[in-house]
Amino acid sequence: MRSQLSLIGKKEGMMHVFDKNGNLVACSVISVDANVVAQLKTASSDGYNAVQMGADVVQAPEKTIEKRFSKALLGHFKKSGGRVCRVLKEVVVSEEAVQSVSLGDEFGLEIFDGVSNVDICGISKGKGFQGVMKKFGFRGGPKSHGSGFHRHAGSTGMRSTPGRCFPGSKRPSHMGCDRVTVKNLEVVKVDLDRKVMLVKGAIPGFKGSVVVVKRSCGVEG
């Protein structure tokens, strides 16, 4: 049942490796330190079954930790052994999975040993306020000097009926900083000594951003 758990990691960047056939494969490097079970939720007490995982344990004197974190958080972490984590993520699991773990348990990349495919969830890179040509791939207007518009969206309405633009149409707006999940990425290598995982292809986020790694649904590892 521990296969239902997700791990919190950090995107370290990308690199190239050679596969068994001699092909050069682009891989994303994810570092995963020990994840701590910070809270257990059950259907009887919370309405659903879930496991809250914590990562990036704070290494600082006790007095410093008391100044930086609220008493509510310190009391929350005290129930799981007192290790304060900077990142908390919740994973919805089955009732059997909740019963198979305990508060304060630590998990690492060993739960992905032998897994062939994983799903990576993270926050995509922010690109600021963008126009419709960059965000949606609009063609734009004529490029000649006499044109009145070059990168505008153009007309998005109709005639006198309905006499308005329907809500939800494509407009210039903020781009990026979205929660993105890339599914079914191939696991190239799991290095337990260095606590890193190599997955084929790109994953969302910038270098140093937090990602969540979980076993792909419907794929046997």
Swiss-Prot record:
InterPro entries recorded: Ribosomal_uL3 (IPR000597), Ribosomal_uL3_bac/org-type (IPR019927), Transl_B-barrel_sf (IPR009000)
Keywords assigned: Ribonucleoprotein, Ribosomal protein, RNA-binding, rRNA-binding
Subunit structure: Part of the 50S ribosomal subunit. Forms a cluster with proteins L14 and L19.
NCBIfam families tied to this protein: L3_bact
Similarity comment: Belongs to the universal ribosomal protein uL3 family.
Molecular function as annotated in GO: rRNA binding; structural constituent of ribosome
SUPFAM superfamilies: Translation proteins
GO CC annotations, alphabetized: cytosolic large ribosomal subunit
Name the record gives this protein: Large ribosomal subunit protein uL3
Keyword match Cell membrane: no
Pfam families hit by this protein: Ribosomal_L3
Function description: One of the primary rRNA binding proteins, it binds directly near the 3'-end of the 23S rRNA, where it nucleates assembly of the 50S subunit.
A GO biological-process term: translation
Record bears the keyword tRNA-binding: no
Gene that produces this protein: rplC
